[in-house]
Amino acid sequence: MTMDKKQAGARPSWETEVEILPIRSEQIDFGHPLHGTYITTGPRSQRGFRLSKFCMAFMSPETRAAFKADPERVMAEHGLSDYEKSLIREQNFNAMVRYGVNAFMIFKLANAFGVNQNQTGAKMRLQSFEEFMKTRNVKDAL
């Protein structure tokens, strides 16, 4: 398996890498992914597994209450790295996706901050909520 790794500025290499997999698909052009998308690969998923598992814990009302009371304690109990904790503190959902966190799990974490799916989408597209809702196929969304 060959990997084409590119670096951009001070960002970690894993944030910009495109991993070429030993499979062929007419639907996926691994050499030219769509701008702003990140191909979910085994290594990327493994890297984000701990943080995805942490987000999954937010299905429990007890975890949500404990996080609301003391987020640092809950993050420490789950053994998150300093970098993973910083992603959570900053609510940096795009970096979480690049890191390998499952997008559906990110919604569970965002909800703990009182951020709904549409607000999360707006944040990930770097748009205001109002701008984002205008792009949705919902009549009279705002």
Regions found by a protein language model. Name each.
Residues 2-142:
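Charged, low-complexity intrinsically disordered segments
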